[in-house]
Amino acid sequence: MASEGLAGALASVLAGQGSSVHSCDSAPAGEPPAPVRLRKNVCYVVLAVFLSEQDEVLLIQEAKRECRGSWYLPAGRMEPGETIVEALQREVKEEAGLHCEPETLLSVEERGPSWVRFVFLARPTGGILKTSKEADAESLQAAWYPRTSLPTPLRAHDILHLVELAAQYRQQARHPLILPQELPCDLVCQRLVATFTSAQTVWVLVGTVGMPHLPVTACGLDPMEQRGGMKMAVLRLLQECLTLHHLVVEIKGLLGLQHLGRDHSDGICLNVLVTVAFRSPGIQDEPPKVRGENFSWWKVMEEDLQSQLLQRLQGSSVVPVNR
């Protein structure tokens, strides 16, 4: 029964769906983490990349005093009570005049758990492109430009990589379409699909307190975890059950994203694909030994799940997380 429950949970995460977070298997030392609040201790930013069939990019001209007249992708901070998609649609409407639908999450960027930006590939579904006659405090205007000939000045050059990422995804999608799942969460946390592979066999680390489950680690907002980024919470959990000095841990990227934003629930859960391997060369048929009784390795026997995991691992078929 436990194996069936784990298989269902893993299948859900691999499909980009996820599940509710009820507790965490690892948390920063000291006080238990308090619920996060937008505008108080966390900031989420949404950004949209639009690519037309003519290979044009939608840009907006900034109205803010510090960058007035420069060009950027439609972007802005989420407001309390919004879902991620609602925030994206509001920002695009305010800055570009268009209605839109997100196609997929393209990238997640973080400066520690308290500042996270969600980058989407999106498509317009209506509205009227904002012109200079409608200039306001949100933007001066919006316009389409050839991807290879963007206007100057740009507000920042970080968007160039994002535009190319969108173009690459359109040409050859590296991961399935992934959209935020509307599931509430109080904390910034990560659910780990931590894998060890040997030949064509895959093991997944599971939490064993209560019903066996994919482990969840809470991100701390203290200065050390802020400086180290969100990988710190992943390494903390693994350090609690594995001897890391003879292992190589790689965070491959995201399988999914969970957030709701209503009823004062401002947390997010990132479902993260992680690999664990031995540092020394040689064939290791068994995963590294687990310390303590709170975690164990689960050998994935279901052929479909095993092949999905191997495909996602070998093709790096995940949403990238960047610092």
Curated annotation (Swiss-Prot):
Signal peptide start-end: none
Cofactor: Mn(2+); Mg(2+)
Family designation: Belongs to the Nudix hydrolase family.
The enzyme's E.C. designation: 3.6.1.58
Leading EC class: hydrolase
Reaction equations catalysed: 8-oxo-dGDP + H2O = 8-oxo-dGMP + phosphate + H(+); 8-oxo-dADP + H2O = 8-oxo-dAMP + phosphate + H(+); 2-oxo-dADP + H2O = 2-oxo-dAMP + phosphate + H(+); 8-oxo-GDP + H2O = 8-oxo-GMP + phosphate + H(+)
Keyword annotations: Hydrolase, Magnesium, Manganese, Metal-binding, Nucleotide metabolism
Gene assigned in the entry: NUDT18
InterPro entries to which the protein is assigned, alphabetical: Nudix_hydrolase (IPR020476), NUDIX_hydrolase-like_dom_sf (IPR015797), NUDIX_hydrolase_CS (IPR020084), NUDIX_hydrolase_dom (IPR000086), NUDT18_NUDIX (IPR042970)
PANTHER family the UniProt entry points to: 8-OXO-DGDP PHOSPHATASE NUDT18 (PTHR22769:SF56), MUTT/NUDIX HYDROLASE (PTHR22769)
SUPFAM superfamilies linked to this entry: Nudix
The protein's name: 8-oxo-dGDP phosphatase NUDT18
